[in-house]
Amino acid sequence: MEAKLKQLEEKAKQDIQASTSTDSLEKVRVKYLGKKGELTEVLRGMGSLSKEERPLVGKIANLVREQIEEALELAKGAVKDKELESKLKMESLDVTMPGKTREIGKRHPLIQAMDELKSIFIGMGFKVAEGPEVETVHYNFDALNAAPNHPSRDMSDTFYINDHIILRTQTSPVQVRTMELQKPPIRIISPGRCFRNDTPDATHTPMFHQLEGLVVDKGITLGDLKGTLEVFIKQFFGNDTKVKFRPHHFPFTEPSAEVDVTCFKCAGHGCSMCKGEGWIELLGAGMVHPNVLRNCGIDPEIYSGFAFGMGIDRLTMAKYEIDDIRLLFENDMRFINQF
C-alpha cells in the first residue's frame, strides 16, 4: 500500500509538470484528489488493512495528498504568470503613441445667459425665488387675474394633467406664492422652465426657459419699472442699446407694456434679423394689477408693484445671433463650443 501511494504521488507530479494551463491543472486535481480520484480510491482500500497498518498508511496518504496539493499550487502560480506574460505580449502598448483625448464639455449658452441675468438682478437687490413646474390652475391662471375664457387656458396652449393640475406656462406662479408667504417689500426674480403646447419650429419649443421679476412696496411707480429695465438691458446688451416701451395688454398688469430694443445685428438700421424694423421685441412688463395684489392678500391701496417677464431662450438667441431655437436643445458640441 505504501509503495502504491508513492507511485501515485510520482505519477501525479508528472501530470502536473506536463500541464500548461489552469484548465489542465484542474483536470489533474480532479483525477487524483476528486471524490472519484485515484488517491480517494486507494484510501477506500484501507479497510482491508490490519489495525496496526492503518495509522501508518493513513499518515503516508495524508502526506501524499499534501505533496500533490502543494505541487498543484506551485504549478498554478507558474501557469498564471506565463498566461499573463503571454497576454501582455499580445496587448503590448507603445508608450510613444499619443493618448486618446476625451472631449471636454462647456457651459451651455443658455446657462451662461441665465447666470449673467441672475448676476445683474442680484446686483440690483433682487433675490432668486423658485417654485414647482407642475402647478395648479389657481396659481397659473386664477390668481393672476386670467379670465375663465382666456385663450391661454385652452388645451391647445397648455399641458393639462387633469382639470386642476397643469405644467406651468410661465414662472408667474412663483410671484403669487411669494406674495402669499412674504409681506412687502418684495424684490424677486424667478427663473425656470415653462411648458406650452407649441409645435417645434425655429422660434418655438414645447419647453422653454423664462425669467420673471416682481417688485412690491409702497410708492412703486411705472418710472421705477422703466429705470430697472433700462439698467438691466444696458448691462446685458451694452450701453449703446436703445429701449422702447409700447402699450400692450396683459391680464396680470395694468398698465402693461412690451419692451423693444435696438437690433443687436444692425444697431437699429434694419436687417433680416429684425425684419427691417431696427427693433426686436424683448419682454413684457407692467404695473401689478390690483386684483392680483388682492388675490395674494396685499392691499393695493397701500402697496403697488411692477412685474416683467422674458424668455431666456430668445434672449440668448438675440445676444448670440442664433437663428433657430432648436439648436439650443440638440446637445451638439460643435454648436456649444462656439460660445
UniProtKB/Swiss-Prot annotation:
EC number(s): the record gives: 6.1.1.20
According to the UniProt entry, its GO molecular function terms are: ATP binding; catalytic activity, acting on a protein; magnesium ion binding; phenylalanine-tRNA ligase activity; transferase activity; tRNA binding
Where in the cell is the protein located?
Cytoplasm
Q: Do the record's keywords include Protein biosynthesis? A: yes
Name the cofactor(s) required for activity, per the record: Mg(2+)
Region labeled Disordered — which residues? 1-20
The similarity comment for this entry is:
Belongs to the class-II aminoacyl-tRNA synthetase family. Phe-tRNA synthetase alpha subunit type 1 subfamily.
A biological process term (GO) from this entry: phenylalanyl-tRNA aminoacylation
Record-linked NCBIfam families? pheS
User: Gene3D superfamilies annotated for this entry?
Assistant: Bira Bifunctional Protein, Domain 2
Q: Give the note describing cofactor binding and stoichiometry.
A: Binds 2 magnesium ions per tetramer.
Question: Any signal peptide, and if so, which residues?
Answer: none
- Entry-linked InterPro entries: aa-tRNA-synth_II (IPR006195), aa-tRNA-synth_II/BPL/LPL (IPR045864), Phe-tRNA-synth_IIc_asu (IPR004529), Phe-tRNA_ligase_II_N (IPR004188), Phe_tRNA_ligase_alpha1_bac (IPR022911), Phenylalanyl-tRNA_Synthase (IPR002319), tRNA-bd_arm (IPR010978)
| Subunit field text | Tetramer of two alpha and two beta subunits.
Indicate which residues the UniProt annotation says bind Mg(2+): 254
Report the main location listed first in the record.
cytoplasm
Q: Which residues form a coiled coil?
A: none
Pfam families in UniProt:
Phe_tRNA-synt_N, tRNA-synt_2d
Q: Enumerate the catalysed reactions.
A: tRNA(Phe) + L-phenylalanine + ATP = L-phenylalanyl-tRNA(Phe) + AMP + diphosphate + H(+)
Q: State the species of origin.
A: Alkaliphilus metalliredigens (strain QYMF)
Tell me a GO cellular component: cytoplasm
Q: What is this protein called?
A: Phenylalanine--tRNA ligase alpha subunit
Keywords recorded for this protein, A-Z? Aminoacyl-tRNA synthetase, ATP-binding, Cytoplasm, Ligase, Magnesium, Metal-binding, Nucleotide-binding, Protein biosynthesis
Which residue stretches does the UniProt record annotate as biased composition, category Basic and acidic residues? 1-14
Which CDD domains is this protein grouped with?
Answer: PheRS_alpha_core
